[in-house]
Amino acid sequence: MKIETYEKGIYQIVKVQEDDHTVNNLSELRDLIIGYLKRGKVNIAVSFCDASYIYSGAVSVLINCFQMVGERGGSLCIIEPDPGLFDILETLNISNVIKIYASESSLPQIPE
């Protein structure tokens, strides 16, 4: 797993890239988010780059991260999902819980 991070507006952008285009283990992402929360950074946008599939264990970690961020008064969202991944997130109703934005430029500039 390759993770790239940077700040944009109020968000910490986290780009996660897997070699096989699937999201299966998000323990590194969870640890990174915990570190952000400890430093008071509570608005996090995650991009899974070219991933077109997400395993159920990864969905569970993602929901757990969403809850941790929410408990700190922050926002965790997904940006720029691959169409295949977007379809899976829609089918699982994840998009009803975690906001999904088409691009970084679509991110809110003030906390929601």
Where do the language-model regions lie?
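STAS-typified acidic loop motif
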Residues: 2-31, 48
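Short secondary-structure boundary/capping segments
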Residues: 3-6, 36, 68, 90
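Short acidic, glycine/proline-enriched helix-loop-strand junctions
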Residues: 6-9, 54-75, 96
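Residues at secondary-structure transition points
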Residues: 20-27, 53, 76, 95
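Short, glycine-/small-residue-enriched flexible loop/hinge segments at domain edges that mediate gating
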Residues: 34-57
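Amphipathic, Lys/Arg-enriched alpha-helical "gate/interface" segment within cytosolic domains
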Residues: 66-109
